[in-house]
Amino acid sequence: MNIKLPTFIELYRQLIATPSISATDAKTDQSNEALINLLANWLETLGFSIEIQPVPETRGKFNLLATLGSGTGGLLLCGHTDTVPFDEGRWTQDPFTLTEKEGKLYGLGTADMKGFFAFIIDALRDIDTSQLTHPLYILATADEETSMAGARYFAANTAIRPDFAIIGEPTSLQPIRAHKGHLSNAIRITGQSGHSSDPEKGVNAIELMHESITHLSTLRDRLKTRYNNPAFVIPYPTMNFGYINGGDAANRICACCELHMDIRPLPGLTLQDLDDLLHETLAPVKARWPGRLSVEALHEPIPGYECPTDHKMVAVIEKLLGEKAQTVNYCTEAPFIQALCPTLVLGPGSIEQAHQPDEFIDMAFIEPTRELMGQLIENFCLAEKAK
């Protein structure tokens, strides 16, 4: 295709120069509208039809779905447009200026994962898209780094059903077919304050929390014993007590105590089943101390995800790469996209650089990724190879 678009490096540069931070703090949170419009302009130049979708209950966030070709099936290439916030004091260069140094491209979002869109657009230069017999979709989502609101909303409302989807998170071009889910809850105990000289006149929230943690530790052991998937390095669900706060003085009965905890379930352990287990575990404390214990989700839970190893689409990717699909413990948008079609997580860059100061992608990924993008489109969208 003879299309006038910026060079690959210039595509990358403009993506990195367009801030799109997601944060729970409204002061830090940013709209991704400018980045969505940038992508829309490039993709329209390539002949895609563009749909921009406001994502409800967000601070000015949008999804973009770009479609080229018609018919059924096809390929969906997905990525999120947002980045995490950055610690200015720990970066040695401007996070919004693409910096090439010693074979690496530095900048916020170079690996995780705005750069993925540059790879897609650059690969399309060499493909005769007039020969597509199955559609090519490109999805750019919002708020993956916080609530995953964009992917949730898209999956719940779209009518498209591709044959296959790739989410371009940084996996070092290693195909990922499964990951654990994530639930994060606040356990809050409301006691009754009083002078420590007469403990019977108060209700010590720290003691009730100790009782609660004892029950939760029992649940942790049950999960470890009951659920096992040897495909994972850590083959059982994990539970972590990550934050606790309570009390204000040694001579005062603690009135309030709060614990933040998370659970990472294996695929197949549903969020509802896990929520039921959690409340069942804490039921004895609630029964003994009515009205004093509450459980509140810190964010919308993310289910575990798994693409069957024997799916024919997985075999195509494994053959292209010469590598077997693996599992990881971190979370992506895959559970939501998997509801539409078989999905793998596969992209350039290393997860080790994600969310780090001086984030970078090694330039050694450029040619293999560009080649892979072309192969994916040929295999799933072009006449002679579309399945």
Curated annotation (Swiss-Prot):
Q: What is its main location?
A: cytoplasm
Q: Which GO terms describe its biological process?
A: L-arginine biosynthetic process
Short name of one Pfam family:
Peptidase_M20
Q: What does the note under cofactor report?
A: Binds 2 Zn(2+) or Co(2+) ions per subunit.
Q: Where in the cell is it found?
A: Cytoplasm
Claim: Hydrolase is one of the keywords in the record: yes
GO MF terms held by the record: acetylornithine deacetylase activity; zinc ion binding
Give the domain of life.
Bacteria
- Names of required cofactors: Zn(2+); Co(2+); glutathione
Under the heading CDD domains, the entry gives: M20_ArgE
Q: Which UniProt keywords apply?
A: Amino-acid biosynthesis, Arginine biosynthesis, Cobalt, Cytoplasm, Hydrolase, Metal-binding, Zinc
Known EC number: 3.5.1.16
Per UniProt, Zn(2+) 2 binds at D112, E145, H355
Q: In which pathway does it act?
A: Amino-acid biosynthesis; L-arginine biosynthesis; L-ornithine from N(2)-acetyl-L-ornithine (linear): step 1/1
Q: Where does Zn(2+) 1 bind?
A: H80, D112, E169
Q: Does the keyword GTP-binding apply?
A: no
| Function statement | Catalyzes the hydrolysis of the amide bond of N(2)-acetylated L-amino acids. Cleaves the acetyl group from N-acetyl-L-ornithine to form L-ornithine, an intermediate in L-arginine biosynthesis pathway, and a branchpoint in the synthesis of polyamines.
Q: According to its UniProt record, which protein family does this protein belong to?
A: Belongs to the peptidase M20A family. ArgE subfamily.
Q: What is this protein's name?
A: Acetylornithine deacetylase
